[in-house]
A protein has these predicted regions:
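Start-transfer (signal-anchor) and selected internal transmembrane alpha helices
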Residues: 1-36, 198, 203-218, 335
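Short hydrophobic/aromatic helix or loop-helix immediately within or flanking a transmembrane segment
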Residues: 50-91, 287-295
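Loop-to-helix entry region of an early transmembrane alpha helix in multi-pass inner-membrane enzymes
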Residues: 74-78, 86-106, 137, 306-313
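Membrane-interface anchor segments at the N-terminal boundary of transmembrane helices
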Residues: 91-92, 276-345
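Multi-pass, polyprenyl lipid-linked donor-dependent membrane glycosyltransferases
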Residues: 96-100, 123-153, 158, 175-185, ...
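Transmembrane-helix signature of polytopic, membrane-embedded enzymes
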Residues: 105-130, 148, 338
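Membrane-interface alpha helices of multi-pass inner-membrane proteins
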Residues: 165-180, 186-191, 219
């Protein structure tokens, strides 16, 4: 039985099984969403807090009204606008999200297969399709699911299909304007290419310089937007989770962290931000650590005990297996460098901004962590198999 024979009958059965489970979940949820707290569908769609905003901007876009347009989410707004212009049902967007989930899951499998083996790819594929918090996002008229899917597809193309230059360029532009955090994954890809190019002569000097300057420029733009449009100085005072006070276990609108100086007295520029951080360094450092813990754990004080336990029971093994893989590693390939950068930069980003209400930000990096956790799990299964064979 050859390892690389994809069309082996036994493997075909194992490969299809995660998709059958995934499809069963979709059907079950579609017809039973009303029995899940805050999960009821409107037809085939789950509307989030920002859905109405996207619809509003999409209608404006159709009417060539570009005032107050959210550039950071322009790709998703444009997609909705096209669907509305063609007079298609909004369910079309949800169907597209499901289709891209199928494609991205297959790309995860291919990445696992190329780096390790088809069985590692299969384990990663299974983890991705059966992790319900991510898959539930397919039903939401929000940017998250497309961002997760296109991030996976883009990284597959960049690292394993470099010849698809036009497709990579188009997808990079689409991802860049899909979510405000899009620069994190693009920056991670760029850094991994630049760093790996020091050990690989295939990347020329001009390409390396272009990547450095291009993403330095992007970083400056996003820093400017963060300070002026999103008011980062004020954001730092809004708590570990935006607008939630852990001291009172309730919403807060002004001071969510006690002991901070008034952010309104600082100028809205990089110097004002740095001065604010200096004046509140110890409090902000402690809060940043808490934010990162909240980010990785997925635990939220307002979620049910069962929900928090479910999340922790999935996250902790994934993180443990992920760390086991990299602690044993002595030499890094480009995709490993990218993954480490993406995880690290994302954690830092949360530390200096805020953890989100629903825990969805961790979903952006989880598929890549699942990949290396799958390799550790596969190695563990091989050890168990050898021990069982030895006893026989």
């Amino acid at each position: 039985m050859k390892e690389n024979n994809f069309f082996n009958l036994d493997f075909k059965f194992f490969f299809v099984t995660p998709y059958l489970i995934w499809l069963s979940f979709i059907v079950f949820y579609t017809f039973n969403s009303e029995s899940i707290k805050a999960g009821e569908l409107d037809g085939f769609i789950k509307y989030g807090n920002d859905s109405s905003t996207y619809l509003f901007y999409a209608k404006n876009l159709i009417n060539f009204d570009f005032s107050n347009l959210d550039i950071a989410k322009l790709s998703y707004i444009t997609l909705i606008a096209v669907v509305m212009f063609l007079k298609l049902n909004l369910t079309t967007v949800i169907i597209l999200q499901f289709l891209t989930t199928i494609i991205s899951s297959f790309c995860l499998y291919l990445i696992g297969k190329k780096i390790f083996s088809k069985w590692v790819g299969l384990i990663c594929l299974s983890l991705f399709l059966t992790y319900l918090p991510i898959q539930l996002r397919n039903f939401y008229l929000l940017t998250e699911m497309l961002f997760i899917n296109f991030s996976i597809i883009l990284t597959y193309l960049v690292f394993f299909k470099k010849e698809k230059k036009i497709l990579i360029l188009l997808m990079t532009i689409f991802v860049l304007f899909l979510r405000p955090q899009s620069f994190l994954i693009l920056l991670s890809i760029a850094l991994s290419i630049v760093l790996f190019s020091k050990f690989n002569k295939n990347y020329n000097f001009i390409l390396k310089l272009f990547i450095i300057f291009f993403f330095s420029f992007l970083l400056l733009i996003f820093t400017y937007i963060g300070i002026n449009y999103y008011n980062l100085t004020d954001s730092l005072s809004k708590g570990m989770i935006w607008g939630y006070s852990f001291e009172t276990n309730s919403l807060c609108y002004k001071e969510c962290i006690s002991g901070l100086t008034n952010p309104s007295i600082y100028e809205k520029n990089i110097f004002g931000l740095l001065l604010y951080v200096k004046d509140n360094f110890f409090i902000l450092t402690k809060v940043s650590i808490y934010k990162i813990i909240l980010y990785f754990s997925g635990w939220r004080p307002y979620y049910s005990f069962a929900h928090n336990v479910f999340i922790l029971c999935f996250h902790i093994p994934i993180y443990f297996l992920f760390c086991v893989y990299f602690l044993r590693l002595k030499k890094f390939d480009p995709f490993e460098i990218f993954t480490l950068f993406y995880v690290l930069i994302s954690a830092i980003f949360i530390g200096v901004t805020f953890a989100d209400w629903s825990g969805r930000y961790i979903m952006y990096i989880l598929p890549f962590m699942m990949l290396y956790a799958s390799k550790s799990l596969f190695n563990l299964l091989l050890i168990l198999k050898d021990q069982l064979n030895t006893k026989k």
